[in-house]
């Protein structure tokens, strides 16, 4: 079966924003105007299509990135039907993993900002993720109908806070309750949408007289930016020739694709204004899959494969390649693997190669997802985003490809968890189900870890924040019927060293009969944080330790890394070289060398100036000025380091770095200090050394445990 929509008419886009910028409402309007939904679902009624998990409907926030497909031919039916695959991503910082994996497979992003709140801390996190994967983006300033809405202030914040180059292609006509429409700065026309039919029809009109000068100024700005990017247009401009709308749009599109500018539009999704023009901008300015070269996405490619795959996005005849970007559990069909096809095509029943795990897999059924509804399809082509049922051993970030042309696509980085809690099943019946449920959830979410503490025998779960863990425990109850008692949150400390040491380790038991003999010399040195957390080097010369015992040496070290030495926390950023030692013809064994390495590492670690590291959070507190003194005093008591303050519409925003261990219970304290008028956001920033007076308390707490 040939493809229905030419690939040039595809747009794979994400919709991204901070909490409450109106992201899900905007997506609902897109689905309404493109004819997917015949009735608009409102978030505050708990009926939004894209928020399909029970917890999302209760809390009114988006947790998982739902995928859906719609078609758009333009506000005035001026385009051929374009297929838009939309991924709606969460705005809460605990779910950054969802944003990260969406960014990896998208071609373009619509960033939504609130016209009142402007650029929020979470917007900056999402922006950094989009920069990392070089995703072209346009902005939509939403909620123009709200009290305090100010479009040009948000444009300025995009410039200052995100260090971007925003270029408005629209101006708002009026604001707050007087917001009536927008000015199209390319056409230089006013657009008004018909409220009687929920904004389906619209009219072009003349720009209001009082706005002509402002519109002319911003139109000129837009033309100059478009002209600077093209020698041909520059000549026309200097010769005072007329530059057509199409030429301006083509030049702006190229600048967006190169990530040089961010085009800005505005509207009010709730009042059905501006979303239709935003869809036109998606088609006119964001990339098709053919605008993104697959070769930039590759990790390990030999020259011959680059030839096969080069610009192969535009061709279904090229070898198949796809990236699995999300695993979800479905109550009816089991595992769903969401994947993005970069080249070629695949049909249900085809055999493909998982090049990361070096295993073959067979595609079972292939489904097109619309939020949580499924439509079964026979095949998918380059540019498609779909889900497969029946892939057994695929995890997030794996590449699926043609067995004859193996390729590995660029992988994703996942953050390490910063907070952990102990969970124990309430009944014996829950015990077995809990293990199954936790494994399923960990499979879906690479930023969620599960393990059993060897000393206490407790099951520990770790994630990106309290809300993250709360929702996972809630899902365990709803989806798997498991009731669990949850302990107090614990900080995920780490241990490391400051200096290099050399240390000998011996394990000798010789008391008649076969003995045990293992003898090693290790060099233990600190590594730069941020890369690999552990490296093992074999520097043995002349066979003083036979090769077959070296994996046991590595294992002995790794067991110590896991259990920690100073205070029982995992050890990171160390490089260990085994450079000397000896063995016994009869008595040496793997067990003896494992124990010798373990002894050497433990003693060496304590001599290498060990330190504890703790997660430091980037916190932003928004507070009315009257409470500034109390809030800052409290943050200082929590070992906070203040980075700066900025004015916002309701008072001040304080930026501060605070250790996670000091932030438990902060929400309640902040509420009581400010009579509920302040709010804060928090995200993981880095690991940093724990001050010596605090280290002692942590070590003592570990020993009593």
From Swiss-Prot:
Name the species this protein comes from.
Baumannia cicadellinicola subsp. Homalodisca coagulata
**InterPro entries given for it?**
EFG_II (IPR041095), EFG_III (IPR009022), EFG_III/V (IPR035647), EFG_IV (IPR047872), EFG_V (IPR035649), EFG_V-like (IPR000640), EFTu-like_2 (IPR004161), G_TR_CS (IPR031157)
Which residues does the annotation say bind GTP? 17-24, 88-92, 142-145
Q: Which Gene3D superfamilies match?
A: 3.30.230.10, 3.30.70.240, Elongation Factor G (Translational Gtpase), domain 3, P-loop containing nucleotide triphosphate hydrolases, Translation factors
Q: State the HAMAP family in the record.
A: EF_G_EF_2_B
- Specify the protein name: Elongation factor G
Q: Which family does it belong to?
A: Belongs to the TRAFAC class translation factor GTPase superfamily. Classic translation factor GTPase family. EF-G/EF-2 subfamily.
Annotated Gene Ontology cellular component terms = cytoplasm
A Pfam family found in this protein is: GTP_EFTU_D2
